[in-house]
Amino acid sequence: MDRELIEICKENSATAFSVGYQIVYLIYVVLSVTSIFTCSYFIKTFIWNSTFHPNFKLLLTMYFFAAIFHSFLFTASYLMMIERFLDYQTDCDIHVSMVPYAIVHSSIACCLFCGMLTQVFMVIERLLATIKIESYEHNTSFWHILAYLFFCIVLPLSLLVWAYQDADYNSPVITAISPPKGVEIRLNILYIFCFFLAILALILLQVVRFVNKRRESRIEISLSGRFQIVENIDTTTFISSILIINMIMSVIYIVGTFTLRNFQFDAFINNQPALATVKTIFYLHPLFSFLMPLISSYHLSKMRERRVKRREHLMAIKTKGREGSDAYNQLLHDQWTQHFLK
């Protein structure tokens, strides 16, 4: 065994047994386990029982399933580390085996990029719903579903094959979330590409929301079109919150890891455990998976409340006699006024 590998083994062993590193990792594991249940509950309660368009339901389900699988795999990566503790005799025994490492790490990367691209296609789907406002409610087919599955699963897999073509899974690592040697440059390109794609998606989402808000008071739109407009406004607000939070955490991760990789800090000189602990803190995906169903539940609950209030308001309007006539005339007056103000 060469001297360089011995030094790596000592550093990695010291990191794995570091109290700070274990506390951070364990906190993220708790968040991951919790998010498995909260995301599953959200899918069952808020997605499958919703009145959303089938295409949007599919993309939203895929997005939350990607978060569930990531949380499951992140927990598995910690269990792999615990397994190495049980067999620990020398410093190099702390490194995870190649095959489990390759399987878990590749799957984690796939979940992350599937989630990133799925949120972009949720924006594209809302754009199509805005363009085909009168017919989109009844516009779904097997080919649409197949296309979304292709772009949200096959495309991320193809990008990962490109990024990991020179991956060395024999790299000595203590956790499956650490990328292998040979992928840093291409992986950074993918992260930056997905980040700027998310910025463009957020800008497009605001344009879609603005267009739907402008259409909301137009009197010539059919009942089906009005329903689609209201759904577009509600869902774009909901997606915006997810995109913004994801972008904030992506910025923290990208800037944090770039800074640690390219600049030296006195606190981390000859202190590999502290450096590894801070890098793990910047890996905010478990925190995002934990917050996402909570924030999404809040937005969709508010959406339901608004729909109930609109329905109660309509039911409270008088429909007979002089009061009914006055109420109807007032509704027409309000609609015409809003229409010509546009």
From Swiss-Prot:
Topological domains, Extracellular: 1-22, 83-102, 163-187, 259-274
Organism: Caenorhabditis elegans
UniProt-listed GO biological process terms: sensory perception of chemical stimulus
Subcellular location: Cell membrane; Perikaryon; Cell projection, Dendrite
GO molecular function, one term: G protein-coupled receptor activity
Transmembrane domains' residue ranges: 23-43, 62-82, 103-123, 142-162, 188-208, 238-258, 275-295
Family recorded in the similarity comment: Belongs to the nematode receptor-like protein srb family.
Pfam families named among the record's database cross-references: 7TM_GPCR_Srab
Protein name: Serpentine receptor class beta-16
GO CC terms in record: dendrite; perikaryon; plasma membrane
Superkingdom, natural source: Eukaryota
Topology, Cytoplasmic side: 44-61, 124-141, 209-237, 296-342
PANTHER family: SERPENTINE RECEPTOR CLASS BETA-1-RELATED-RELATED, SERPENTINE RECEPTOR CLASS BETA-16-RELATED
InterPro entries referenced in this protein's UniProt entry, alphabetically: 7TM_GPCR_serpentine_rcpt_Sra, 7TM_GPCR_serpentine_rcpt_Srab, 7TM_GPCR_serpentine_rcpt_Srb
Major location (coarse): membrane
Keyword terms of this UniProt record: Cell membrane, Cell projection, G-protein coupled receptor, Membrane, Receptor, Transducer, Transmembrane, Transmembrane helix
